[in-house]
Every structure is written in C-alpha cells, then in structure tokens.
Amino acid sequence: MTDSHATGDMPRVTIYTDGACRGNPGPGGWGAVLRYGQHEKTLKGGEAVTTNNRMELMAAIQALRTLTRACDVALWTDSEYLRKGITEWIHGWVKRGWKTAAKQPVKNAELWRELLAETQRHRIEWHWVKGHSGHEGNELADTLANAATDEIQAAKRQAMAGEQ
C-alpha cells in the first residue's frame, strides 16, 4: 500500500479511523479508510463485548498494520483519547511502567503497546476532526465502524436463535 506522492522517500498515506460501540461495554466495531494517490482501501472489524475506546485504538492499529512499508502518514480521528494518548500521554505511561500519573494501571495497555509498536515504522501526523461534522473521510470510517457493529449484533442474534 504505497503512494507515488511521497515525502522524501516515504509514500504519503492519509488514514481516517473511527470506533463505535452500542453500550459501553457492548458490541462494537471499528472502521478505517486508507488513501494513497488514486487508491482507497477500507477496513472494518468488531468485537461482541468491547468499549468505544478499544474500537478507536483497533481502527488505528489495524490501519497502520495494513501498510506494507514505512510511510509518511496523516491519520485523522475524532477521538481525543486516541490522539492525545499517542501524542501526549503515552510517554509518561511508558516511563511509569504503564501506570497513569495517579499510579493506576493504564486502561487498554495491551492495545496502546500494539499501537506504539506500529507507529515505530512510520512518520505520523495525528489530526483530530470533529465527529459527525460532515468530514467525508471521517463519515466513511464511521459508516464502516457502524456496519461492523451491525454485523456483530446480527451474528449474536443468529447464534441466539440457533440455540433455541
């Protein structure tokens, strides 16, 4: 997944991510849109019992994991938790052995570790966009996240119907 419009020798990729959850915890999904040149790739997935923050993290992890080589990435999210977590808070968490400033264990630490590992391969600019504000890339990621959530809920209903 690369783009001929590169910064230096790194391909330039734009990523939009979003997470969704019905109930918190509850069934949830994540969606990602990756754009490079004239190409677009969409990704989605979900879990039967999760949280909105876990789905926001999964969207970014899976999108970055999809890139086959080091890239110059502009990643857009409507989650301040994700953006601030990876750009501001994570450095302190690592220094404190994955504890918060209040000495509590960091929530979703295993996902933050995965995200941190994925970021090491790329040069990433993290951007925040207001959710549900008509931003086309974010809206598409939101649609994918909700579609994944719908699929999780449908599979659960089907499994429950089969048990009767």
UniProtKB/Swiss-Prot annotation:
Keyword match Transmembrane: no
Binding site for Mg(2+) 1: D18, E56, D78
Xref: InterPro entries: RNase_H (IPR050092), RNaseH-like_sf (IPR012337), RNaseH_domain (IPR002156), RNaseH_sf (IPR036397), RNaseHI (IPR022892)
CDD domains: RNase_HI_prokaryote_like (cd09278)
UniProt KW keywords: Cytoplasm, Endonuclease, Hydrolase, Magnesium, Metal-binding, Nuclease
Compartments, as annotated in UniProt: Cytoplasm
Enzyme class: hydrolase
EC number: 3.1.26.4
GO MF term list: magnesium ion binding; nucleic acid binding; RNA-DNA hybrid ribonuclease activity
Cofactor: Mg(2+)
Cofactor note: Binds 1 Mg(2+) ion per subunit. May bind a second metal ion at a regulatory site, or after substrate binding.
Residue span, RNase H type-1 domain: 9-150
Biological-process GO terms, alphabetical: DNA replication, removal of RNA primer
Record's keyword annotation contains Oxidoreductase: no
Catalysis: reaction(s): Endonucleolytic cleavage to 5'-phosphomonoester
One CC-aspect GO term: cytoplasm
Pfam families: RNase_H
Binding-site residues for Mg(2+) 2, renumbered to this chain: D18, D142
Summary of subunit composition and partner proteins: Monomer.
Summary of the function given for this chain in its UniProt record: Endonuclease that specifically degrades the RNA of RNA-DNA hybrids.
Homology family: Belongs to the RNase H family.
Name of the featured protein: Ribonuclease H
UniProt organism field: Chromohalobacter salexigens (strain ATCC BAA-138 / DSM 3043 / CIP 106854 / NCIMB 13768 / 1H11)
Gene assigned in the entry: rnhA
